[in-house]
From Swiss-Prot:
The lineage of its organism: Bacteria, Bacillati, Bacillota, Bacilli, Bacillales. It is an enzyme of class 1 (oxidoreductase). Inhibited by HQNO, a quinone derivative. Homodimer in solution. Forms homotetramers; dimer of dimers. Contains a first dinucleotide binding domain, which harbors FAD, a second dinucleotide binding domain, which interacts with NADH and C-terminal domain that provides anchoring to the membrane. A long discussion has taken place about whether NADH and the quinone bind to the same or to different sites. Structural studies clearly indicate the presence of distinct binding sites for the two substrates. The keyword NAD applies. Binds 1 FAD per subunit. One of its GO terms (molecular function) is NADH:ubiquinone reductase (non-electrogenic) activity. FAD binds at G12, A13, G14, Y15, A16, N39, K40, V83, D302, A319, Q320, K379. Pfam families: Pyr_redox_2. Its EC number is 1.6.5.9. This is Type II NADH:quinone oxidoreductase.
Length: 402
């Protein structure tokens, strides 16, 4: 019987991959399949909390937990390694720690920052990408305040922060910044009126997923707390001084001691090397989340471009969608092991909340708009639920937001 066990290989321990494994380990016996999870880090991090760690309102250590803490060691083999190649036809995955065979493969390799080719953005701006970049950014911001306080010749740029992007990540980061700045000013004896936070967005509207009423609430709240918005203002370059923007056809230099890019992500760059038809690290999947020509390969999370039946555009890359995809794939792997056909993935939209710091927010929950403290509370519920869904009540109690 042991020789008949299928090899299930899962790449990535983000929301999608880890949800797949934690659901699958409960659904199958050790005789049915050998499950291997490969992740480049020994920890999982809550990607939707990175804006907090980046601003310094949450310690970076609170954003992560060991992958093995949520695994059943008798059912799942965890390998800390970096994937270097996926060979679909040979059913092999190459890593820096060896080669792994598979019968069923789940690709959930996550996201990296996308700068859209803007000159200098990768070199001169901080990215909100992982716990390492979050730690670097939060420390850099505090170092700038400390330097300003200690310097005899004050440089106002030390207290100036530029944020590129007024989408979800950018706005949530701005909200956390407005919570963090008063603490830093108090700690280092800095006049808060000297702090300058500017958000630059190329699109004509911020938070395009929300109504004008909710957007206006977010803008008013953040402006009241010191944020200046430059909407419909493309960033054409980034340098050591800050952003270069285009206004009425002319280039302008915006100066700041801290530049942050929060305007785009893409799927893993390994996707282009491993599959055809990949755009920005995402591949269009079939309705059961497998890919054309390979019924044994599932692609989920940030690497997946899932277009619901009857729709024209793929679903966005969110933690909620990734976790639902993980659940669906776990069920389908169980069905495959039972000799049954797979079922189509059906996304249930439970709503979206954008935090504006720890005390305010905007969102749509079950089709109804919410704002203010109610939205902030709901965001904490959503964050805690995500931890609970993967790690159970113990992890939710330890890492949750309550």
């Amino acid at each position: 019987m042991a020789q008949d066990r299928k090899k299930v290989l899962v790449l990535g321990a983000g929301y999608a991959g880890l949800q797949t494994v934690t659901k699958l380990q409960k659904a199958i016996s050790t005789e049915e399949a050998e499950i291997t999870l490969i992740n480049k880090n020994e920890y999982h991090y809550e990607a939707t909390w990175l804006h907090e760690a980046s601003a310094g309102t949450l310690n970076y250590e609170d954003v992560l937990y060991p992958v093995e803490s949520v695994l059943k060691k008798d059912k799942v083999n965890f390998v800390q390694a970096e994937v270097t190649k996926i060979d679909r036809d040979a059913k092999k995955v190459e890593t820096n720690q060896g080669i792994y065979d598979f019968d069923i493969l789940v690709v959930a390799l996550g996201f990296v920052s996308e700068t859209f080719g803007i000159e200098g953005m990768k070199d001169h701006a901080f990215q909100i990408e992982n716990v390492i970049t979050a730690r670097e950014l939060s420390r850099h911001i505090e170092d700038k305040f400390a330097n300003y306080a200690a310097s005899k010749e004050k440089d106002d740029n030390d207290l100036s922060i530029l944020v590129g992007g007024a989408g979800f990540t950018g706005v949530e980061f701005l909200g956390e910044l407005t919570d963090r700045i008063p603490e830093l000013c108090s700690k280092y004896g800095v006049d808060q009126n000297k702090v300058k936070i500017t958000c630059v967005e190329a699109a004509p509207k911020m938070l395009p997923m929300f109504s004008e009423e909710l957007v206006n609430h977010a803008v008013s709240y953040l402006e009241d707390r010191g944020v200046e918005f430059k909407i419909a203002t493309p960033i054409v370059a980034c340098n050591e001084k800050g952003f270069v923007v285009e206004v009425d056809g002319e280039k302008q230099q915006l100066n700041a001691g801290t530049s942050v890019w929060a305007a785009g992500v893409r799927g893993s760059k390994l996707m282009e090397e491993s599959f055809e038809g990949v755009k920005r690290g995402r591949i269009v999947t079939k309705q059961d989340l497998t890919i054309n020509g390979y019924d044994n390969i599932f692609v989920i999370g940030d690497c997946s471009a899932f277009i619901p039946a009857g729709e024209e555009r793929p679903l966005p890359t969110t933690a909620q969608i990734a976790m639902q995809q993980g659940e669906s794939v776990a069920k389908n792997i169980k069905r495959i092991l039972n000799g049954e056909s797979t079922e189509e993935f059906e996304y249930v939209d439970r709503g979206t909340v954008c935090s504006l710091g720890s005390h305010d927010g905007v969102g749509m929950v079950f089709g109804k708009p919410i704002a203010g403290k109610k939205a902030a509370f709901m965001k904490k519920v959503i964050d805690t639920r995500a931890v609970f869904k993967i790690g159970g009540i113990g992890l939710a109690f330890k890492k949750g937001k309550f």
